[in-house]
Amino acid sequence: INNGNYYIEPTKAFVAIDVNTASDISFAAGLKANLAMAKDLPRQLRLRGLGGQIVIDPAPIPKRDRKALERALKAAFRKDTVETNFVGWTAMGLLELQRARNRPNWLNL
């Protein structure tokens, strides 16, 4: 993603997604990086065959911008064929999703 990056790390417990903004730590850069991740995430999860519990650690954004991130993620996942449910935000500002597993993930092949 432009002006940032994100990492997808499958663990035994869940899939962790960490979004970073590189050197720009402004809220605007955080929102931009999070929205770019939201558009790309369904494709990346599908390519890797990842599902189950997914926890996103977004780049820092104000609470008022959380709805914009949720809308972007929901729009992106609506276009995807794998069922994905939004669980909600944790007290620590992480976003939880639940995604159906429709095939073995690429790490287990």
Descriptions of predicted regions:
Residues 2-109:
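Conserved glycine-centered short motifs in functionally critical loops
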